[in-house]
């Protein structure tokens, strides 16, 4: 069985992601150990909370995560985990991210729409990629976020509309570093299928 490690860096919904992966037949480990991360077949970077707090907690693992990404093995960031994959965020003050995917994290502008963007919304699939194998365009998934990713079309796997069009799922140029702004572990059968697809990529 493939070894999937959920990175424990002090922030994130580790147990719900673990349960989602177990539901699709994986046996994930939760670890912040660099050796366990580097020897994994795939890693997941979950996250809830503030971007700047996440980056402070990730300082000891920044090089390890970059090395894993360079190896070509699959990596998935979820929610805040997607945001920290990017170059920078304007949350709090301008804060540098892991810079594994070019792009910025911006706050939703003031409008009649409530922020955070919370609840079910549909996504538009923009690229043919194994992460979205068998997922229908227009599928509904579950979001909870006040900031969104702004990146290129080349780095966008799926988009979502909430006052503006934003990247609901991102990918690097090699195709192995991916992110979802939505929570696949809370997105019913669609989300579980996405997690299953990730496991199959590992």
From Swiss-Prot:
The keyword Lyase applies. It is found in: Cytoplasm. Pfam families: GATase. The active site is at residues 79, 183, 185. Keywords: Amino-acid biosynthesis, Cytoplasm, Glutamine amidotransferase, Histidine biosynthesis, Hydrolase, Lyase. Gene3D superfamilies: 3.40.50.880. One of its GO terms (cellular component) is cytoplasm. GO terms for molecular function: glutaminase activity; imidazoleglycerol-phosphate synthase activity; lyase activity. Its EC number is 4.3.2.10, 3.5.1.2. Its main location: cytoplasm. GO terms for biological process: L-histidine biosynthetic process. Pathway: Amino-acid biosynthesis; L-histidine biosynthesis; L-histidine from 5-phospho-alpha-D-ribose 1-diphosphate: step 5/9. InterPro entries: Class_I_gatase-like, GATASE, Imidazole-glycPsynth_HisH. Heterodimer of HisH and HisF. IGPS catalyzes the conversion of PRFAR and glutamine to IGP, AICAR and glutamate. The HisH subunit catalyzes the hydrolysis of glutamine to glutamate and ammonia as part of the synthesis of IGP and AICAR. The resulting ammonia molecule is channeled to the active site of HisF. HAMAP family: HisH. NCBIfam families: IMP_synth_hisH. This is Imidazole glycerol phosphate synthase subunit HisH. It comes from Methanosarcina acetivorans (strain ATCC 35395 / DSM 2834 / JCM 12185 / C2A). The lineage of its organism: Archaea, Methanobacteriati, Methanobacteriota, Stenosarchaea group, Methanomicrobia. The gene is hisH.
